[in-house]
Amino acid sequence: CVRAHLMIYELQDGSPDYPTLVSRNRPDGRPIGWGAISGMVADAEAPGILYAVNDSFYGMQPTIFRIDANQSPAAITDAIPVTRAGAPAQKLDLEGIALDGDGGFFLASEGRPGRMIPHGIYHVNAEGGIEDEIAWPKALRAVARRWASEGITRVGSTLWIAIQREFDDDPAGFVKLLSYDLESEAWGVVHYPKEPTETGWIGLSEITAHDGFLYIIERDNQIGRAARVKRLYRVALEGLAPVAIGEEPPVVEKELVRDLLPDLTRWNGYAVDKIEGFAVDAAGEAFVSTDNDGVDDSSGETHFWSIGDL
């Protein structure tokens, strides 16, 4: 565990490598505050334009951030508050975001029953106002644990949600990918096989649909030299056949796309643990981001970078 570190700098000519993500001022001159970036999604038409949500560290300020990655460093140019009846929405832990195809978004919230935060999906308009709430079915809530929704993506009329770690009814090493049909309101599930680990735990932290595949971030919870698994996998949508909640889920086949650990160490610091955002823009360029936990018990660094075209 890295409890403290010393950073050494050398003055030289050239462009700085860090920060990789900054924010612009609002029209009234006030800065846009941000942190704890979690799930991401790309604008459907404008290359380099992304949207991201913050998680429960800013529980009183759930926000959708607009990111312009066409500049260096990438810049947060707008912050859209998530509201319920005109006030900042409470009892949310936003971990995923998907476009709804009509200018709004679907947001995945990771529940925490002990704090009265429900598991669910929220449909918001372009201004961030909650228009609909999709609750988890009773059979799913009955087996859920704290480490739940960690990404959401839309494929036509189906939403796919990545679950971070095993629920009570999952065998060790397998986690759920949930499906929700917006037309029939039917839930489904498949099993995703995780990598083995001897230290800490491994879970999923993002899911993004692109060009016939579901791209999934799989990571351990280790930092520095202990970090081993920070990877991007993909699962083919063709042949994916979810079954009803409570039935035996089929196991999907995954394919390694990229080891992200070398990316995390290219800034010459220690590898942070929380890769939580992945999006592919309208031009096919893929972007990755990390969650800085709102600088609490963290180095405070947010890394945002492109891995090029998929």
For the regions a protein language model found, what residue spans apply to each?
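Sequence/structural signature of beta-propeller domains
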Residues: 1-310
